[in-house]
């Protein structure tokens, strides 16, 4: 890993642990939101990849040190997460940290659970400039996509039984109806196709194509 563990201050004044992979002052920022496994090496690796692409990247530890590779435990951790607190405190605090440390524009990107939190962040965090969501959508009562006022890019899998194609259709319909600035892409892949630790779901061709699209999108909207 090329970054380091840090702490940043949340809006409520308390602190949150995070992994920071910084490029240099003045570069645009990206907050990378974990999957339901926790802040593991795979998510830190994505932050490193974003740093190599020219961004200052930070991944907040939403589970406060807890990490697992077992689905049952991951589901338990996700079910116990305070989603409003994660959005309004941890993720917003990470956005503010990047902005106060030289990134004039900041995006949030996330996978699975983090994808749902990306949409929630796009709705609720006023300092945010763009969002990139991978195969995750929050309940509409928590974060209505019709309220999004920043550019949003979405990446979804056609063979996904967690964030289903029908759910992606519903998201697109909401974004289209409110005139949102959005891009939505679909891949002939499984849920989690960007997780290179998953022998079953990882699809390098789809993942690399999504990353290319992400870079173009962020370069445009964070310039």
Question: Each PLM stretch: what is its role?
Answer:
Residues 1-223:
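N-terminal cap/leader regions of alpha/beta-hydrolase-fold enzymes
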């Amino acid at each position: 890993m090329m970054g380091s563990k840090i702490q940043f201050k949340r809006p409520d004044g308390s602190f949150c642990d995070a992994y920071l992979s910084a490029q240099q002052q003045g570069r645009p920022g990206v907050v990378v939101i974990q999957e339901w496994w926790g802040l593991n090496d795979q998510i830190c690796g994505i932050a490193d990849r974003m740093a190599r692409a020219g961004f200052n990247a930070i991944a907040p530890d939403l589970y406060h040190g807890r990490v697992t590779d077992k689905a049952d435990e991951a589901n338990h951790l996700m079910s116990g997460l305070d989603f409003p607190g994660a959005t309004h405190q941890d993720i917003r605090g990470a956005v503010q940290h990047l902005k106060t440390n030289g990134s004039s524009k900041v995006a949030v990107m996330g996978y699975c659970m983090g994808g749902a939190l990306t949409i929630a962040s796009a709705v609720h965090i006023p300092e945010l400039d763009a969002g990139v969501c991978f195969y995750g959508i929050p309940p509409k009562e928590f974060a209505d996509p019709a309220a999004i006022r920043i550019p949003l890019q979405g990446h979804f899998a056609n063979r996904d039984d967690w964030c289903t194609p029908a759910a992606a259709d519903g998201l697109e319909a909401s974004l289209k109806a409110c005139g949102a600035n959005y891009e939505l892409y679909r891949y002939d892949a499984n849920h989690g196709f960007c997780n290179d630790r998953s022998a079953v779901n990882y699809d390098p061709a789809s993942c690399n194509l999504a990353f290319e699209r992400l870079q173009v999108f962020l370069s445009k909207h964070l310039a």
